[in-house]
Amino acid sequence: MDNNKKKDFFYFKPSEEIEEEIIDCFMENPVDENMFNQQQQQLQNNHENLEINEEYHQTINEMEDMIFTYSNTNISNDTNLSDNNVSDLIKLEIYNSNNINNNIYNTNNSNTNTNYNNNNNNNNNNNNNNNNNNNKNNNNNNNNNNSNSKIKRRNSIILDNVGTIIRIDTTNISSTKKRRIFK
C-alpha cells in the first residue's frame, strides 16, 4: 500500500435506519464516481466553478453527521475482509487532504490491497494524527484560499460494486468525531 494515498480504512454494517437514509439520500443525489473525479479535476483547475457542486456538497455535509452518529457501535477494522465480500457493508476510508493530488479518489487504484496487518494500520493512524496536527498549524494559510480549502476538505461518498464507500478527510473532522472512529 502507498502510505501517501490512503491512511486507513474501516468497514461497518449500518443500522437499518442509517441504511435507509443513505439510500434515500443517493436516490435524490446520486454520485457517479467518474463524474465526481472529473468535477474534482475541474474544480482544482478552476475554482470559480465551485458553485456547480453546491448541492452535492450539501448532501455530503448532511451525510457526515449521519455516518458518525450511527457508525460508532458498528465499526470494524477486520483486516480479513476483502472488497469481494462486503457488498452489504460500508467501507470508511481515512485519508489526509495533503494527499489530494495522489489520485485518492480512484477506487481502482486505492482499494485493491485491503489485507494489511494491524500493526500497519496502527502506524498509519499515528501518521494520520501527525499530519492532522501539521494541518492545524497551517489553517491560516489555507484560509487565504477558501476555494482550494473547500475542495480539499470535502468528504466523498461513492456507490460502487463494494457498496457504499465513505472517504473521510481527517483534516476537517473534530476530535470528538475522530474518537468515534479511532477508539
Swiss-Prot record:
It comes from Dictyostelium discoideum. Residues 105-151 are annotated as: Disordered. It comes from the Eukaryota. This is Putative uncharacterized protein DDB_G0291786. Residues 105-149 have a biased composition (Low complexity).
